[in-house]
């Protein structure tokens, strides 16, 4: 019901299934939503990758992903952090080498919240080693059901599991899943 009314994404434009509300209307809704103790939804699709796709995605990417994000049909996770990179995201090592109309992705992400539940991951990958480390990074949308992807749990001290490692071994990703220009994902 919330999705049908656009209330799942009150800051999304009406054309993509949101309400088109202004900041005041959105704030009032958020306060009432919290007062009702309604459950929060995962931010990865609605708040993080959805707006990126709206701003920088192709029309085909918008048509493919936005309706499935707002309906809750497609669950996302974020692939940024890597072992050895710490808070220096630009030092990422996961490589995506272009072969024709695909990238071949190899590497690892860590501290990936809810990857074990996600259908897709949006990831920063290194597509070039030339220039400063902030250059040569591209933004890819990757289907987690693609062969070569392994999700391993990171069990917390209390026995909980919401963080994961995600391994990419010769994962083939269509070039059409890149957001924006190659090497301009930073």
Where in this protein do the model-derived segments appear?
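Internal helix-loop-helix
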Residues: 3-73, 113-120
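Short Ser/Thr-interspersed hydrophobic loop/turn segments at strand-loop and sheet-helix junctions
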Residues: 6, 29-34, 124-125, 141-146, ...
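A glycine-rich, basic-preceded beta-loop-alpha segment at the flavin cofactor/substrate interface
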Residues: 25, 145, 152, 157, ...
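A short, Trp-centered hydrophobic/proline-enriched beta-strand micro-motif
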Residues: 72-80, 124
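Active-site-adjacent elements of ketosynthase-type condensing enzymes
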Residues: 84-92
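Glycine-rich phosphate/pyrophosphate-binding beta-alpha loops
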Residues: 86-87, 110-115, 157-158
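A structural signal for short hydrophobic beta-strand segments in well-ordered beta-sheet cores
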Residues: 94-97
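A short core secondary-structure module
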Residues: 102, 106-152
């Amino acid at each position: 019901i919330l999705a049908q009314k656009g209330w799942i994404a009150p800051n999304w434009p009406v054309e993509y299934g949101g309400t088109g509300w202004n900041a005041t209307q959105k704030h009032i809704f958020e306060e009432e939503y919290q007062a009702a103790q309604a459950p929060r939804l995962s931010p990865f699709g609605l708040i993080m990758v959805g707006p990126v796709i709206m701003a920088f995605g192709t029309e085909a990417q918008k048509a493919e992903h936005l309706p499935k994000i707002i309906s809750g049909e497609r669950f996302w996770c974020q692939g940024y952090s890597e072992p050895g990179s710490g808070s220096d995201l630009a030092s990422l090592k996961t490589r995506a080498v272009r072969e024709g109309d695909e990238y071949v992705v190899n590497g690892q992400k860590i501290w990936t919240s809810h990857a074990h539940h996600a259908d897709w991951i949006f990831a920063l990958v290194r597509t070039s080693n030339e220039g400063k480390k902030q250059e040569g990074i591209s933004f890819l949308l990757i289907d987690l059901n693609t062969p070569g992807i392994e999700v391993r749990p990171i069990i917390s001290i209390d026995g909980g599991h919401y963080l994961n490692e995600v391994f990419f071994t010769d994962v083939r990703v269509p070039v059409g899943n890149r957001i924006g220009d190659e090497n301009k994902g930073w």
